[in-house]
Amino acid sequence: MNKKTALITGSSRGIGRAIAILFARNNYNVVINYNKSEDKAKELYDMLTQEGLSVRMFKADVSKIEEANALVNYTIGQFENIDVLINNAGISKPCLFTDISYEQWNEVISTNLNSVFYVTKKVLQYMLPNCSGHIINISSMWGLVGGSSEVDYSASKAGMIGLTKALAKELGPSNINVNAIAPGVINTDMVKDLSEDTMEMLKYETPLMRIGQPEDIAKCALFLAEQGDFITGQVISSNGGFVI
């Protein structure tokens, strides 16, 4: 049986890294995408190849059309097909709305939302003829309810959810599933600057009484890819009950 292939944007660190590890260890060909974190990507690549797993790595700023296209072309050149696309690349720059510069707004929207359009559009050139595929967009609970001091981030993640729902309706007849995962507070670099007291408060406000781990989101992604054949257009809220 041929291996399936998963392309994961922004997969050198955090949630993307955990997804890459889990998919590679579950018999997928995996393409690790990075932009600035080359050392982290190489470290992950070396770890997985030493385990005898099928992985590649490719540098691309997916907020740029040409680089997004190059990433997809590379993946097809290596593995001939893309069965699972996970749009994970994202940035967050918390600040008051009145302090958001035009440059920051454009950077956040381009990285978090435009990249999803660019990569997905190119990948569909290969998924549509096969009438098969899973697209999983990593959004955020702030895309559902909005986050104070994260208006640009919240807008980008809400846009991902709208894209997910609309695209699922378009692609359903072609047997392509499109879903989103909306993580809560996850132990990644995005929260590394929060104080210990703030982290304890967030933990206390989460009914499951813990901060999420990247592996929690990776398990959701693998479930959707492996067992989610009758799930499409949905938002899986993996947030420990923080948002209900």
Where are each of the predicted segments found?
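Active-site helix of classical SDR
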Residues: 120, 156, 164
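Conserved glycine-rich cofactor-binding loop
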Residues: 12-13
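C-terminal substrate-recognition "lid" of short-chain dehydrogenase/reductases
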Residues: 117, 132, 210-238, 243
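Alpha-helical segment proximal to the catalytic Tyr-Lys
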Residues: 125, 169-173
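Short, small/polar-rich loop/turn modules that mediate ligand/substrate recognition or access, typified
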Residues: 172, 177, 231-233
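Substrate-binding pocket helix/loop in short-chain dehydrogenase/reductase
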Residues: 96-97, 104-109, 191, 198, ...
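Residue(s) in the substrate-gating loop at a strand-loop-helix junction
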Residues: 140
